[in-house]
């Protein structure tokens, strides 16, 4: 499955997730949700400028932009995790999401198919990875068949290498259903200890990986980065 053929609603992460935690496949879902979501993506700041600056001058426009940022900041959420998965594994990804949130209290989290529509795949992936503390790669038989999934995991790994605070943030996971055998796992992922849901030590693995202190550190850096961009834009 190439990028242009993906049926997953893979569009950029809006980071305003307080009102929804499940996939809705109704016809009007993406249209209504995209109107509610307000994205402060670094690539999207210029668009806000065009819609907020009125004809009365730069000063009034700057004030409007500042007010807009303050309102949106109240709704922004830095996610605990995002699950990247193959198109055919949406149900399994939802099950894992609920497992982590309900059984282990690791929330909020999201799966790739839940993201609101409106952006291209690359922007969507960038927002998802950088808008969450951990990136979970759902290793199933379908994962290797999906070209887009292969691109996702390579991009996620490079991001974790190039950004110090993202070190060890990529978590391969073999779920209970249709897991990818170790011997067929890409070499780049074999070097990382994967979460094994069928293992007796799975609960211990989860507690060791998803530490609140790590989340808080990444959340602070995320907020500082966004605030810096907002100040530069307003100035």
Swiss-Prot record:
Residues 73-229 form the TIR domain. GO terms for biological process: cellular response to lipopolysaccharide; inflammatory response; innate immune response; negative regulation of chemokine (C-C motif) ligand 5 production; negative regulation of toll-like receptor 4 signaling pathway; phagocytosis; positive regulation of canonical NF-kappaB signal transduction; positive regulation of chemokine (C-C motif) ligand 5 production. GO terms for molecular function: molecular adaptor activity; signaling adaptor activity. The modification Phosphotyrosine is found at residue 167. A lipid is attached at residue 2 (N-myristoyl glycine). Residues 30-39 have a biased composition (Basic and acidic residues). InterPro entries: TCAM1/2, TIR_dom, Toll_tir_struct_dom_sf. Residues 1-39 are annotated as: Disordered. Keywords: Cell membrane, Cell projection, Cytoplasm, Endoplasmic reticulum, Endosome, Golgi apparatus, Immunity, Inflammatory response, Innate immunity, Lipoprotein, Membrane, Myristate, Phosphoprotein. Changing residue 16 to E: Significant decrease of localization in the membrane. Expressed in spleen, prostate, testis, uterus, small intestine, colon, peripheral blood leukocytes, heart, placenta, lung, liver, skeletal muscle, and pancreas Isoform 2 is ubiquitously expressed (at lower levels than isoform 1). The keyword Lipoprotein applies. Phosphorylated by PRKCE in response to LPS. Phosphorylation is essential for its function. It is depleted from the membrane upon phosphorylation. Tyrosine phosphorylation is inhibited by phosphatase PTPN4. Changing residue 2 to A: Results in relocalization from membrane to cytosol; Loss of ability to transduce TLR4-signal. Loss of TLR2-mediated activation of IRF7. One of its GO terms (cellular component) is early endosome membrane. Changing residue 116 to H: Loss of ability to dimerize. Significant loss of RANTES-inducing activity. Loss of ability to induce NF-kappa-B activation. The modification Phosphoserine is found at residue 16. The TIR domain mediates the interaction with TRAF6 and MYD88. Homodimer. Interacts with TLR4, TICAM1, IRF3 and IRF7 in response to LPS. Interacts with IL1R1, IL1RAP, IRAK2, IRAK3 and TRAF6. Interacts with protein kinase-inactive mutants of IRAK1 and IRAK4. Isoform 1 interacts with isoform 2; the interaction occurs in late endosomes and disrupts the interaction between isoform 1 and TICAM1. Interacts with MYD88; the interaction decreases after IL-18 stimulation in a time-dependent manner. Interacts with IL18R1 and IL18RAP. Interacts with TLR2. Interacts with RAB11FIP2. Functions as a sorting adapter in different signaling pathways to facilitate downstream signaling leading to type I interferon induction. In TLR4 signaling, physically bridges TLR4 and TICAM1 and functionally transmits signal to TICAM1 in early endosomes after endocytosis of TLR4. In TLR2 signaling, physically bridges TLR2 and MYD88 and is required for the TLR2-dependent movement of MYD88 to endosomes following ligand engagement. Involved in IL-18 signaling and is proposed to function as a sorting adapter for MYD88 in IL-18 signaling during adaptive immune response. This is TIR domain-containing adapter molecule 2. It comes from Homo sapiens (Human). The lineage of its organism: Eukaryota, Metazoa, Chordata, Craniata, Vertebrata.
């Amino acid at each position: 499955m190439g990028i242009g053929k993906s049926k997953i609603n893979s569009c950029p992460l809006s980071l305003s997730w307080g009102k929804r935690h499940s996939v809705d496949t109704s016809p009007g879902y993406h249209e209504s949700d995209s109107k509610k979501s307000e994205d402060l993506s670094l690539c999207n700041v210029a668009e806000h400028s065009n819609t907020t600056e009125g004809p009365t001058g730069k000063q009034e426009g700057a004030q409007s932009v500042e007010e807009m940022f303050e309102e949106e900041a109240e709704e922004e959420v830095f996610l605990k995790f995002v699950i990247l998965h193959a198109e055919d594994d949406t149900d399994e990804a939802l099950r894992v999401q609920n497992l982590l949130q309900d059984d282990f209290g690791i929330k909020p989290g999201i799966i790739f198919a839940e993201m609101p529509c409106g952006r291209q795949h690359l922007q969507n992936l960038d927002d998802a990875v950088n808008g969450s503390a951990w990136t979970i790669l759902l290793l199933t038989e379908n994962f290797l068949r999906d070209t887009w999934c292969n691109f996702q995991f390579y991009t996620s790994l490079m991001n974790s290498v190039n950004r110090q605070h993202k070190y060890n943030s990529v978590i391969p996971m073999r779920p209970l259903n249709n897991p990818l055998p170790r011997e067929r796992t890409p070499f780049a992922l074999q070097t990382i200890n994967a979460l094994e849901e069928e293992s007796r030590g799975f609960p211990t693995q989860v507690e060791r990986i998803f530490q609140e202190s790590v989340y808080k550190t990444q959340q602070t850096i995320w907020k500082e980065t966004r605030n810096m961009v907002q100040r530069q834009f307003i100035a």
